[in-house]
Each structure stands twice: as structure tokens, then as C-alpha cells.
């Protein structure tokens, strides 16, 4: 046997060893897959369905349609003409929990789950139409309550979600003392745009878009700790945004911290000093409260008048050190619900192109109700906004406990005043800012070259009184 043949013979056991190890690894992988396939695994929600999965979903919808058609003649009319017929309820049997839905409340396996269910099948070549439904887990039946609101996004579905939130009977519960970030930022670029909510165009400002978008992320993330809360407001957000189901908490917190730092006071540039004159200096500029000028509907501007402007480096937005502090998650939910109601007043017929632009708008009238009443009445009904207010302690001169019922016996020089939480305060102050811009734009064609008004955040209620509709 030659030397070359000896090398080949010695290499044969090594090749066989590698082949046997490969087969062993493949067998272990196959066994692991087999074990996992037997267990109950939760399917990944973002995977594309295979052909078999699509066929199974199609058969499920066909079965639902057959049961709906076989109930009565109302079922046929409800299916073919959903917007023209009104019924109290249609009950059909359903063995499994549906897939195409938007939750209106938590999933309760021992009772009823409220949702908006898409009852149209894909083979009908029609857009998705959501109808408010109640699924009974114990009886394995679903109750459809027509008429459907339509597609999502749409103004009809947003209005129906606001109507359901007014009743508050979907099983939602409070979230205790869980806090979150305040997304009502004041120091943001100001611009207006038109959003398409379905086929409806809505005029929205930039601060409202920032607030609603960040609120959708924060409340979706808050459901990790509050599993029975925020379903209705998250359903409303689907009419404006595409919020992912799973949110990276670390990225969200870092983003909110960066945005929060941009709202703080402007830092002063440190100056070089000699060793002899070293002293303690304040890292921030001193905040001086300045009353904003009064703006009315008949204000006049003079083109030759000297306008004093505050330097950008000295502009402060909040005199205290607790600016942009955390708020309760339930307060954020209530404020977001209120802002969603204002979208209806920015749409037709309340916002026609040929409207009287100098008259009081329906949007301002609706906001004025919130200022004067903690349970304001809207076109969707009465909403409870009491969580957006708190008792603020204010000093009282020459007043005793017997003179005023609001004065506490232990501190006769102080009393409580009902005021707004920070997000609502910033929201109202932004209306003051927009009102200045509105009056400036009305006077600009008549007077030509004018300097835009400077605005500082309102530091007290007397500054907010500059709103021309405040005292009405």
C-alpha cells in the first residue's frame, strides 16, 4: 500500500465522524421543532399568512356570513345594506374568538368582551366595515349591534368610539397611581395642516398632532402595566395613526426625555472668570413674569409703532422647576379623549370655507365649556373631565376662616382655587398663542409690513384672561 493510499484510508474515519455529527445535530433540531409544534405557541402577529392560512380565514368568514344570512331576512339586509337598515341586535353563534377586531375593552374570558368586529369577508371585494359587537365567551355567541360605523380610519367610527367612551360600560378599569410623561409640548414648531380621517378633511395644528401621536405611543405602552385600561382611547388613535402593537420601552423613554429637555429654560453660556472672583452663579437665566398684551377681535396695529421683542436666549416657558413633570395616565387618557372630540368641531359643517371668520367658532365655544365646567357637554354627550383639575393653594390677605368657606381653619391666610393641570394649561395657552396669530393674519393685509407677535407661556390666570372668549 502506497503513501497516497494510506492518507486516503486515514481520512475516511474523519469524514464519517463529521457526517455522523451533522446527522445528530439535524435530529436534535427536528426533535426540538416537533416538541415546540405540539405545544401551544402564540403566533407572531406580523407574519404574512400562508395560502393555507388565508384559506382557513376565508372559510371562517364564509361560515360567519352563512350563519348571518340564515338568521332571518334582517341578516340579509344587514349584510347587503348595512347603512340603510337599523336593528337592535343580531346574535349568531361563533365557536372561536374572532380575528379581525378592534378592542373596546379588555378581553374577559369568563364574561363578555366588547369590540368592533369586521364582518365583511375578503371575497366580497368590499372594504372592511366595523360594527360594534359583544362576544360571549361562555355561550360562544357574538352579538352584532348595527349599523356599522364604517372603515377605520373614518370620522363615523371615531364618533362612535367617543359615544361608547361616554357610556364607559366596556369593562375598562382605572390604572391607580401609574404615571407617565407629559406629551403636551409647548416649544414646538407651529404649522397647520389638513388630515384625512377617512374621506373627511380636518384642520389640525402641529401641537395637536404631536400630542395625539405621542399619547398614542405612551398609552399603548402603558397597557403593559394597566392591562384593563386605555382600550377606547387606543381605538380612537387608530383613526389617525398606525401604532405598532409592541413598543420598545427604552427607545420611547429616551425619546421623551430628549423632548422634555428641549422644553426647559435656556441655559446661560458660562463666562470665564479669574481665580480671585470665583462665586456661585445660577445655571439658568432668571425668569421675569411679563403680561402678554391683550388681544381682542377689534385690535388695531400700527405699521410705524416700535415693537419690543424679547431676545430668544432669554425666553422662558415656565417659572418653576417642575416644568414638564409626570402626570397620571388616567389624566392623559381624559385629556386625549377631549382633544379627539375637538376634531369633530374642526370638520364640516362646523368649519365651512365660506364661514364668517370673525365670528366665534364652534371649536372655541366647545373649549369654553371645558374651562367653566368639569363635566362639559359635547355633541357626544357629557364627559367627566374632573381629573384635569386640582386645588391650588393661594394666599388671601385680610381674610379669616369665618369669612370664606374655602379657607382652611389651620391656615387662615390661604385658600384653595380650582385650576388646571399642566397639560390642560399648556393646551389653553396654545389657544391664546393661536389667537394672536389669527388676529395678526387678519390685520396683515390692511397694514402691510407688521412684526409677528411675541408670545410667552402664561404664568397665571390673569394672563390667560387675555383670551377674548374667556369671560364670555
Curated annotation (Swiss-Prot):
Its main location: virion. N-glycosylated. The keyword Glycoprotein applies. GO terms for cellular component: plasma membrane; viral envelope; virion membrane. It is found in: Virion membrane. Forms the envelope trimer complex composed of gH, gL, and gO. The trimer interacts with host PDGFRA. This is Envelope glycoprotein O. It comes from Human cytomegalovirus (strain Merlin) (HHV-5).
Amino acid at each position: 500500500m502506497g503513501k497516497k493510499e494510506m492518507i486516503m484510508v486515514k481520512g475516511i474515519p474523519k469524514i464519517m465522524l463529521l457526517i455522523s455529527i451533522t446527522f445528530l445535530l439535524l435530529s436534535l433540531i427536528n426533535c426540538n421543532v416537533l416538541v415546540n409544534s405540539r405545544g401551544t405557541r402564540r403566533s407572531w402577529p406580523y407574519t404574512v399568512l400562508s395560502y393555507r392560512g388565508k384559506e382557513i380565514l376565508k372559510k371562517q368568514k364564509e361560515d360567519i356570513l352563512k350563519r348571518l344570512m340564515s338568521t332571518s331576512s334582517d341578516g340579509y339586509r344587514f349584510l347587503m345594506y348595512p347603512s340603510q337598515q337599523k336593528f337592535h341586535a343580531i346574535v349568531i353563534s361563533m365557536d372561536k374568538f374572532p380575528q379581525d377586531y378592534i378592542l373596546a375593552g379588555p378581553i374577559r374570558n369568563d364574561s363578555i368582551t366588547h369590540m368592533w368586529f369586521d364582518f365583511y369577508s375578503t371575497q366580497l371585494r368590499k372594504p372592511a366595515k366595523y360594527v360594534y359587537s359583544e362576544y360571549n365567551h361562555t355561550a360562544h355567541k357574538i352579538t352584532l349591534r348595527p349599523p356599522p360605523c364604517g372603515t377605520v380610519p373614518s370620522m363615523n367610527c371615531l364618533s362612535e368610539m367617543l359615544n361608547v367612551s361616554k357610556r364607559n360600560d366596556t369593562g375598562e378599569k382605572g390604572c391607580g397611581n401609574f404615571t407617565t410623561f407629559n406629551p403636551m409640548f409647548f416649544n414646538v414648531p407651529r404649522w397647520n395642516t389638513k388630515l384625512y380621517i377617512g374621506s373627511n378633511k380636518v384642520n389640525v395644528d402641529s401641537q395637536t398632532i404631536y400630542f395625539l401621536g405621542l399619547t398614542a405611543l405612551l398609552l399603548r405602552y402603558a397597557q403593559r402595566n394597566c392591562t384593563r385600561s386605555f382600550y377606547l382611547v387606543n381605538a380612537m388613535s387608530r383613526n389617525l395613526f398606525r401604532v405598532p402593537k409592541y413598543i420598545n420601552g427604552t427607545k420611547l423613554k429616551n425619546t421623551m426625555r430628549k423632548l422634555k429637555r428641549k422644553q426647559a429654560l435656556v441655559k446661560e453660556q458660562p463666562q470665564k472668570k479669574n481665580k480671585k472672583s470665583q462665586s456661585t452663579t445660577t445655571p439658568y437665566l432668571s425668569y421675569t413674569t411679563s403680561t402678554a398684551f391683550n388681544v381682542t377681535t377689534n385690535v388695531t396695529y400700527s405699521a410705524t409703532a416700535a415693537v419690543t421683542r424679547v431676545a430668544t436666549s432669554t425666553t422662558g416657558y415656565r417659572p418653576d422647576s417642575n416644568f414638564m413633570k409626570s402626570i397620571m395616565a388616567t389624566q392623559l387618557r381624559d385629556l386625549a379623549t377631549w382633544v379627539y372630540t375637538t376634531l369633530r368641531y374642526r370638520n364640516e359643517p362646523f368649519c365651512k370655507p365660506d364661514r364668517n371668520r370673525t365670528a366665534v367658532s364652534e371649536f372655541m365655544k366647545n373649549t369654553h365649556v371645558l374651562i367653566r365646567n368639569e363635566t362639559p357637554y359635547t355633541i357626544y354627550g357629557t364627559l367627566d373631565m374632573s381629573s384635569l383639575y386640582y386645588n391650588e393653594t393661594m394666599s388671601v390677605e385680610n381674610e379669616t376662616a369665618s369669612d370664606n368657606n374655602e379657607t382652611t381653619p389651620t391656615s387662615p391666610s390661604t385658600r384653595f382655587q380650582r385650576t388646571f393641570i399642566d397639560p390642560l394649561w399648556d393646551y389653553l395657552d396654545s389657544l391664546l398663542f393661536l389667537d394672536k396669530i389669527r388676529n395678526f393674519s387678519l390685520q396683515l393685509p390692511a397694514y402691510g409690513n407688521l412684526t409677528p407677535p411675541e408670545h410667552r407661556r402664561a404664568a397665571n390666570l390673569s394672563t390667560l384672561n387675555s383670551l377674548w372668549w374667556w369671560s364670555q
